[in-house]
C-alpha cells in the first residue's frame, strides 16, 4: 500500500482521494479551510451543476478549445461516469434544460456530503486548517 497525499479538498481533491483509496492506498487530504468543497458549495447558485449530459462529441464541439489535449481526460472518466458515480453512491440526479445535471435535491451540500461519505467509508483522512507551503522530493520521490 502506498501513501497518497492530496493538497486541497475541493472537488478534484475529493474525487482523487476516493479513487486513490479504492485502489488500496492510504490517503490523506490537506485542506487549508475548515471544510471540504467550499467552492463546490456555491456552484450552480448553490445547486451544484454536476456535469452536462450531452454526448461527448457535442461536449468537445461546444466546450473544449484544445480537443487533443483534453481527449484522454474526458474519455478516461466521462460525464456519464460522473452521473453513475453519484447515483451509485446514493445521490439521485436530474437533467434540466441545456442537459445540465443537478442533484435531485437541488442542494450542493448533498453532493459534498456524498463525496465525504465515500471518503469516510474508504478511510480517507482529512487534515483541516493545514496549509502546504512546500513539497520536497527526497531520494527521487515525494
What do the predicted segments below correspond to?
Residues 128-141:
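A conserved short coil-to-beta-strand element within the FAD-binding core of flavoproteins
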Residues 32-125:
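Conserved N-terminal/central alpha/beta ligand/cofactor-binding core
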Residues 8-13, 37, 44-46, 129:
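Glycine-centered flexibility sites
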Residues 4-7, 27, 111, 123-124, ...:
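Hydrophobic aliphatic residue packing
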Residues 2-29:
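N-terminal Rossmann-like FAD-binding beta1-loop-alpha1 element of flavoenzymes
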Amino acid at each position: 500500500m502506498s501513501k497518497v497525499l492530496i493538497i486541497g479538498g475541493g472537488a478534484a481533491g475529493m474525487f482523487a482521494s476516493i479513487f486513490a483509496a479504492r485502489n488500496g492506498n492510504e490517503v490523506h487530504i490537506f485542506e487549508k479551510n475548515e471544510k471540504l468543497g467550499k467552492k463546490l458549495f456555491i456552484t450552480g447558485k448553490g445547486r451544484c451543476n454536476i456535469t452536462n449530459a450531452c454526448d461527448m462529441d457535442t461536449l468537445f464541439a461546444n466546450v473544449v478549445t484544445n480537443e487533443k489535449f483534453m481527449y484522454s481526460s474526458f474519455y478516461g472518466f466521462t460525464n456519464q461516469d460522473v452521473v453513475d458515480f453519484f447515483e451509485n453512491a446514493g445521490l439521485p440526479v436530474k437533467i434540466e434544460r441545456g442537459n445540465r445535471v443537478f442533484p435531485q435535491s437541488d442542494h450542493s451540500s448533498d453532493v459534498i456530503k456524498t463525496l465525504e461519505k465515500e471518503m469516510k467509508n474508504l478511510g480517507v483522512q482529512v487534515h483541516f486548517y493545514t496549509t502546504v507551503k512546500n513539497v520536497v522530493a527526497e531520494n527521487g520521490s515525494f
